[in-house]
Amino acid sequence: MTYMQLRSSTKKVKINEANNMAVVFEKNKPPSSIKRAELKTVLIPKPIIKKGIICGLEKYAAIYKAIAKHPLVLGKCPSRPYHTINVMTKSQNALILTPSMDINKTQHLLLKHSLLDYIGLKSNMAQFEALYGSVLEPMTSKEMLSFQDLFFETKRRTEDIIFVLNTICEHRFVHPVRASVTPQVFKDIVEKYFFLFPAKDKSNSINFAASVVEIICNGEPFSKVIQYVNAYMDIKEHTTMNNLIKIYALLTT
């Protein structure tokens, strides 16, 4: 019996070459069964995520709930997903679509990436699952309905913003639009947006769009938003083919 040992500073591996087998297959005979070498120990890998990830909106809702109940502590969770979500919470989370809700910034980020995942776009849901998959809890009907309302309100406001920005993007203003008292964050968001998707009248479009995005995020009904915009320009009823790209750009601003 021949043994070969491989040594390093941290591990020692022993290979038993007696367990190697050679099998000859003959053309006119069926192959004989091959017996596996018996192993003294069988290692069963432990799952990284202790509980199965729930499918559909339930998955998003369960992670949303876990974020509120389990603040992350570096050293007690996977480091790479922790840093990814931590950086994105600060750098790609400017647009708060539901500012009236008393939820933290990580939950706002989760809402946006849940929406991206829901409509089939690239998201960071895998990082959220890696961080919170082991602490997911069952959702009550009340909690599920509450999250569902919040999720689809986020979706509606996102779609409303894209629709209005498509109209503003195509308009040439006759008179200059003064910058309003809209918070600077909304001006920064639409400025980045029009950098990616240029408007015909960029400067005026930024000033006008910032105030419109603000009122949409504050919950103004779409009918009133359209009525307001239509007082200054014709509504662009037919949207472009690259709306999904625009949604991704908006939600990752």
From Swiss-Prot:
Annotated protein name in UniProt: Uncharacterized gene 23 protein
> InterPro entries given for it?
Herpes_BTRF1 (IPR006772)
Q: Name one Pfam family in it.
A: Herpes_BTRF1
**Source taxon at top rank:** Viruses
Taxonomically, what lineage is the organism?
Viruses, Duplodnaviria, Heunggongvirae, Peploviricota, Herviviricetes
Native organism is Saimiriine herpesvirus 2 (strain 11)
Q: Which family does it belong to?
A: Belongs to the herpesviridae BTRF1 family.
